[in-house]
């Protein structure tokens, strides 16, 4: 059975009076006022959850960090619906934090370059429902949780940052906008020291508290303060997005347009008659006016009115929609990629000049990506012209074929087209026979060369990854500061073992409240004291420089807590009675409550030595002898929190 402290881990929403807590089958969202359950997020194995974190901007979303390296974002106000599934490659998560950072920069009159992208038409995308292909506005991949929110009063662009620590604590992953990962190597962290708490001091500034009492600072400030660096990051993310945007629509052309049309032609012409025989007999019909019995039978029984309309519809869709996609998707995307690559190259060159003594950027991959983008644009324009010619041939063929079909079906049919009016009709018709009535004619390349496009776009994707790895990541890593670990408590307790139990930043205050367990190392002359093992201290630190604000207070543990596991004690910043009620709601087995006010012996005559005496609230489960215990509010500099203790497991 999992520890009760994990079962009743409560995390309050920063904006709404709701909280998230673990239940047997996942996470549940409750309203604080009446404890009504608002949503349930099912999770098959709750032990795979590393931790979870609220959206601090709108309060609508919850990020759940899983130990397998995935992050799931759920919309709490839509029944906990999954809106995004993120995967960080080669990472096993131990703990993570989600930060939404508004990007605010003062307008600079010296910026002479206007943003050409703003003057380009908005991107669109093609989708297919059960009936037809439609055009809809394009939305970014993570727009469901990153897009503009009508309830968000801050209209500034935001940089979403998921900071993830891996299980070995030797690597930190900074995941930008749910799409772009930058890995930071941390060589000075001992693997056996687990990360206990990540505290956000301010936007992009975090204090990471480890079990041994050491603290490490992660600071994204230099990155956020450099508009050019943020632009560099945005450019590479947009280039990656646009490449995926084109690849998605290329597969759409192949799946929804080219393949259905060419498969139909293959079944109707090759499998039902044979390409070679059909081509020669259609040529004889056109040049000599002769029609064989087999051809007439094929026209009447295999083609017929229904298949004729189907053939014409699929062909028109294949040619016309492909031209539309190339014109409205590929051309704008190529133009944007070329512009963004030029912008990216300019920033990298500027950084290279600025830091020429220590860093020189190799822009070979950038040049290759630029040339590939230009090549793709040229190939797209040529394909549009070629498809226009093919569509003309297709239309002429069906004008002639319509008369031939209805002649076979109806002896009294009157011809509707006189091809003598078109001097090139005969040549165009025979050219179409050569083009479509052959094995080569029903390959995907007969519409557009999908393989050629796919190979070129994939090579562009490889170049983008190369640029990200060789040029962008190295620059971003230089602008993210990971300080060496600081041993905050070593000087104060030089001969003791420190075990940090918890640390929290109280809202609207610039200090951190910590809870530590201090175990003194007994000398040979000094007898072992059980009291030394269970000495808890509560104190405060400045959030930025970790300076000690006031003398810490020792926690006098009530006798009722002797059998509770102090090493798992943590803060719960809420009302104690609410916590007990939460426990009761979360698990109906917890049905009995004992409240005992603890007061030390001779309490009224006792001098104030800085020790905190705490009342105890205990919740027990009679069926399996598991307990949850929590203290009353512990006041620290005018603010308060509660402590929670899980029961020690009894050895059988």
Curated annotation (Swiss-Prot):
What are the alphabetically sorted keywords of the record?
Answer: Cell cycle, Cell division, Cytoplasm, Mitosis, Nucleus, Ubl conjugation pathway
Which Gene Ontology BP terms does the record give?
Answer: anaphase-promoting complex-dependent catabolic process; cell division; protein K11-linked ubiquitination; protein ubiquitination; regulation of meiotic cell cycle; regulation of mitotic cell cycle
Origin: domain of life: Eukaryota
Name where it's found.
Answer: Cytoplasm; Nucleus
Q: Is ATP-binding set as a keyword in this record?
A: no
A single cellular component GO annotation: cytoplasm
- Annotated InterPro entries: APC4, APC4_long_dom
Q: Which PANTHER family match?
A: ANAPHASE PROMOTING COMPLEX SUBUNIT 4 APC4, ANAPHASE-PROMOTING COMPLEX SUBUNIT 4
Q: Quote the subunit structure annotation.
A: The APC/C is composed of at least 13 subunits that stay tightly associated throughout the cell cycle: APC1, APC2, APC4, APC5, APC9, APC11, CDC16, CDC23, CDC26, CDC27, DOC1, MND2 and SWM1.
What is the protein's given name? Anaphase-promoting complex subunit 4
Organism, as annotated: Saccharomyces cerevisiae (strain ATCC 204508 / S288c)
Report the gene name.
APC4
């Amino acid at each position: 059975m999992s520890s009760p402290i994990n079962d009743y881990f409560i995390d309050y929403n920063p904006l709404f009076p709701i909280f998230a807590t673990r239940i047997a089958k996942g996470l549940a969202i409750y309203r604080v006022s009446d404890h009504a359950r608002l949503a349930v997020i099912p999770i098959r194995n709750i032990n795979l959850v590393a931790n979870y974190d609220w959206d601090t901007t709108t309060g609508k979303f919850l990020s759940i960090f899983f130990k397998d390296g995935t992050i799931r974002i759920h919309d709490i106000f839509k029944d906990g619906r999954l809106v995004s599934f993120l995967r960080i490659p080669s990472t096993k998560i131990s703990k993570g934090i989600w930060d939404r950072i508004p990007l605010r920069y003062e307008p600079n009159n010296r910026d002479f370059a206007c943003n050409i992208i703003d003057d380009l038409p908005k991107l669109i995308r093609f989708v297919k429902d059960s009936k037809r292909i439609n055009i809809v506005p394009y939305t970014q991949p993570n727009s469901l949780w990153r897009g503009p929110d009508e309830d968000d009063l801050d209209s500034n662009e935001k940089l979403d940052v998921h900071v993830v620590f891996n299980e070995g604590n030797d690597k930190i992953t900074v995941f930008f906008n749910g799409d772009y990962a930058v890995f930071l190597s941390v060589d000075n962290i001992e693997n056996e020291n687990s990360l206990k708490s990540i505290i956000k001091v301010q936007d992009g500034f975090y204090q990471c508290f480890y079990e041994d009492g050491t603290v490490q600072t992660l600071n994204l400030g230099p990155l956020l303060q450099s508009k050019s660096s943020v632009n560099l990051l945005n450019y590479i993310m947009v280039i990656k997005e646009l490449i995926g945007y084109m690849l998605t629509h290329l597969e759409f052309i192949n799946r929804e347009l080219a393949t259905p049309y060419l498969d139909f032609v293959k079944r109707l012409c090759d499998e039902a008659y044979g390409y070679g025989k059909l081509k020669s007999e259609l040529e004889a019909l056109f040049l000599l006016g002769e029609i064989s019995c087999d051809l007439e039978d094929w026209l009447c029984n295999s083609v017929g009115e229904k298949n004729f309309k189907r053939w014409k519809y699929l062909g028109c869709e294949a040619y016309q929609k492909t031209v539309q996609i190339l014109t409205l998707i590929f051309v704008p995307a190529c133009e944007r990629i070329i512009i963004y690559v030029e912008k990216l190259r300019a920033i990298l060159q500027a950084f290279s000049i600025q830091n020429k003594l220590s860093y020189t950027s190799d822009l070979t991959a950038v040049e290759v990506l630029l040339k590939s983008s230009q090549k793709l644009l040229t190939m797209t324009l040529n394909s549009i012209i070629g498809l226009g010619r093919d569509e003309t041939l297709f239309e002429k063929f069906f004008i002639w074929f319509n008369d031939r079909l209805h002649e076979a079906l109806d002896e009294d049919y009157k011809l509707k087209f006189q091809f003598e009016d078109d001097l090139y009709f005969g040549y165009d018709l025979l050219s179409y026979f050569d083009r479509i009535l052959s094995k080569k004619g029903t390959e995907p390349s007969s519409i557009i060369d999908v393989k050629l496009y796919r190979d070129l776009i994939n090579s562009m994707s490889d170049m983008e990854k190369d640029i990200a790895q060789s040029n962008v990541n190295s620059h971003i890593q230089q602008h993210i500061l990971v300080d060496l670990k600081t041993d905050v408590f070593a000087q104060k307790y030089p001969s003791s073992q420190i075990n940090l139990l918890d640390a929290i930043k109280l809202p609207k205050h610039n200090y951190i409240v910590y809870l530590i367990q201090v175990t003194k190392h007994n000398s040979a002359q000094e007898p072992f004291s059980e009291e030394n093992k269970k000495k808890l201290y509560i104190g405060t630190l400045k959030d930025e420089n970790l300076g000690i604000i006031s003398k810490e207070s020792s926690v006098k543990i009530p006798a009722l807590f002797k059998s509770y596991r102090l090493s798992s004690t943590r803060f719960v910043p809420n009302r104690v009675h609410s916590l007990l009620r939460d426990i009761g709601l979360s698990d109906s087995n917890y049905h009995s409550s004992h409240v005992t006010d603890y007061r030390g012996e001779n309490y009224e005559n006792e001098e104030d030595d800085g020790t905190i005496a705490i009342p105890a609230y205990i919740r027990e489960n009679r069926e399996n002898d598991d307990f949850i215990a929590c203290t009353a509010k512990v006041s620290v500099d005018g603010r308060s929190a509660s402590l929670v203790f899980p029961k020690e497991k009894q050895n059988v």
